Design a protein with these regions (language model features):
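Aromatic- and glycine-rich beta-strand/loop motifs that create alpha-glucan
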Residues: 1-26
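Alpha-helical transmembrane segments of integral membrane proteins, especially early/N-terminal helices
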Residues: 21-34, 107-108
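Short, hydrophobic secondary-structure boundary micro-motifs
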Residues: 27-29, 90, 118
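Residue-level signal for short hydrophobic patches within transmembrane helices
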Residues: 12-16, 27-30, 58, 71
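Alpha-helical membrane-interface segments at transmembrane helix boundaries
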Residues: 17-21, 59, 79
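Secretory targeting signals
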Residues: 36-77, 101-199
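Helix-loop-helix units of permease transmembrane domains in multi-pass membrane transporters
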Residues: 77-109
């Protein structure tokens, strides 16, 4: 049982790491975060229905981009293994098929969980910003992607860290910091949390 768990965690961790290094993940996550965060500004003049429109649009975008990202990551994870020939070598060793495919699924699910954390945080903040004005939260929310990219670029230049995975993780961390700041100051639309968790 212990060996099975070690193999499972090793394959799932490598799958998550490979998925985090895909440029499409960073591109889709950043564009989703920016689009959701700009929705309160773009949909400002809707005669009192701005909050509902922002909430529905943000949840729909969260679902659609998560679906596209999950499909791409799952097909890319298995496609790479088949093209490289590592699938046959892994399955010829004492790794069962069910363990391999469940670990691949868990790795893709881990990457999607990070994506959902980022877009869920932005959805909660955008739902509140559509109703109430919070300039400090808005500024922090709009600068989080740029700060993540800038710091990831510096880490890539000086420490040779991979840009895509570092920028993605920093984006999630910076959005979490903005969320904590907004929660402390009372600028979070908590009623969107169950819907965001269902997605």
């Amino acid at each position: 049982m212990k060996m099975w768990l070690q193999r499972f965690l090793a394959i799932a961790g490598l799958t998550t790491l490979e998925a985090l290094r895909q440029p499409l993940l960073l591109l889709l996550t950043t564009s989703t975060v920016v689009a959701i965060s700009l929705m309160p500004v773009l949909l400002m003049y809707t005669l009192g229905e701005a909050q509902k429109l922002v909430q529905d649009s943000a949840l729909a975008l969260h679902f659609l981009c998560g679906l596209l990202l999950g499909g791409y990551a799952a097909s890319a994870a298995l496609g790479r293994e088949i093209r490289r020939g590592t699938l046959t070598s892994v399955l010829s060793k004492p790794v069962e098929r069910s363990t391999f495919f469940l670990a691949k699924f868990a790795g893709v699910a881990g990457m999607l969980a990070l994506f959902s954390i980022a877009t869920g945080i932005v959805t909660l903040l955008a739902g509140h910003l559509a109703e109430n004005s919070a300039p400090a939260v808005s500024i922090l929310l709009y600068t989080a992607p740029f700060a993540a990219f800038l710091l990831a670029g510096l880490l890539n230049y000086f420490n040779r860290r991979p840009f895509v995975s570092t920028a993605f993780v920093l984006l999630v961390v910076f959005l979490t910091v903005v969320f904590v700041f907004a929660a402390v100051t009372g600028h979070v639309a908590w009623r969107l949390l169950p819907a965001s968790l269902c997605i």
